[in-house]
Swiss-Prot record:
Notes concerning its domains: The N-terminal domain does not have lytic activity and probably modulates enzymatic activity. The C-terminal domain is the catalytic active domain.
Organism: Marinobacter nauticus (strain ATCC 700491 / DSM 11845 / VT8)
Subcellular location: Cell outer membrane
LT domain, as annotated region: 265-502
Annotated EC: 4.2.2.n1
Matches recorded under SUPFAM superfamilies: Lysozyme-like, Periplasmic binding protein-like II
Membrane topology classification: Peripheral membrane protein
One Pfam family from the record: SBP_bac_3
HAMAP family: MltF
Protein role: Murein-degrading enzyme that degrades murein glycan strands and insoluble, high-molecular weight murein sacculi, with the concomitant formation of a 1,6-anhydromuramoyl product. Lytic transglycosylases (LTs) play an integral role in the metabolism of the peptidoglycan (PG) sacculus. Their lytic action creates space within the PG sacculus to allow for its expansion as well as for the insertion of various structures such as secretion systems and flagella.
The protein's name in its UniProt record: Membrane-bound lytic murein transglycosylase F
Amino acid sequence: MSRFISTFRSSSAQLSIVLAVILATGCSQPTTLQEIREEGVLHVITRVAPSIYYQDREQDTGYDYELARLFANELGVELRVRVADDNSEILSVLSRNYAHVGLAGLTQRPDFDNQYRSVPIGVSAQSVIVYHKEVPAPESLEDLASETIHMLADSNHEHLIADPANEAGPIIQKHPGLDAAGLLARVESGEFGYAAVASNELDLNHVFFPKVYEAFALNEPSDLVWLFPAAQDDTLVNAAEAFMERVNNNGTMAQLAERFYGHLDRLNYVGARTFMHHVENRLPRYQSLFKDYAQESGMDWRLLAAIGYQESHWRPNAVSPTGVRGLMMLTRTTANYIGINNRLDAEESIEGGARYFRMVHGRIPDRIPEPDRTWFALASYNVGFGHLEDARRLAESAGKDPDRWMDVKEFLPLLAQKEWYTKTRFGYARGHEPVVYVQNIRRYYDVLVRITEPDAPSASGLEDQLAWLGDNEAGPEAPAKESQPDLRADLPPELRLIPPTL
């Protein structure tokens, strides 16, 4: 018995020492924020969406991404981005504490309380029901009894619609393989009659889908949030909350919200009156530069001027939050490559734009005849050569001619839909933009040619004839010239909203 007591006391003493060491070690463990600073990396997981994260001219951008980049800079660490297939993957990774922050474009949900912590990011959204214009317009969920409502997987909408007690309620159909653009495209084509989407994603995509109408909201606007694993301590969440408060107070958050949500970037265009005013008042300052550098590059100066107008409205001090700047809106990488030192100098910018367009034009295969080769070059100037090649490959795989702009422009918008861009080499792109970009430059060029020819009408005299340069020219009601066929008849239904080019 005494031996047992002695052994027990000895074991107890050893156990006490071990426990003391464990407790001491636990107390000295670094916090989440300390671990991030020691590693020098902030790990975020996100998905591709125009409201969250995407690449524009080969640069990462997006509202959530820009905030995360600023946050990482403030912490003095590298931002490392992992791109998930969908929200289900983001939530799974966070639940296992395999990332520091999740950028999912979600609002706080009841089922998040015990799994994730959240920090508002200064933008709100609500769940809305949309429908194809040719189906009955619903006013409430009661009008959708026994109808199918389509939505993305792990979205905010299901818990607002599902009612186990109501067997006659709407049928919920979730689509893990789709993104918001793909969902809206199916409503546009009539494949889906009704869908639930986030209002911010509808706002950013609605211009492309004019047959998709908004019916009603399922809830009041709620803050979009960043999500943090519940397994973390408070330090990173507290730092994020303090950061959000600072960027809100200093105006940075408002600037980002205006850029990504206040307008549709390149998809809202000035009307004829403004364009002709700039032709008369701005163009003369730079016309000789356009002529000189266009001649050096072997191109029509009016085409170079049209590119400049589309890029900056001929403003030499134009600056984008992504770092693109100057009259021709050159990236720093492009400027360095072609030997331009000051992008805000009008002459250097025009010279750089002419050089760069000549380089881009030279990459387009010689076998492609004009003017298609120029249209391809313009699209590449806007969206990048890699994305253009992706669209050409998609066109070829569908039995279309990859050397015809009329064929390839059908496939560029598909690069914004997950089911398509995941099959390409260069991934997501806002593929509608180069289509409208080329269209507008052709229109501006056509006007410049007309007013610079002998016996041409004055700029002011053309205003009333240029209704097709109106504010909504990217929308479905933009008329084409009567002498031109409507090429939309040959497009897939979800792409017929793209106005015909001149």
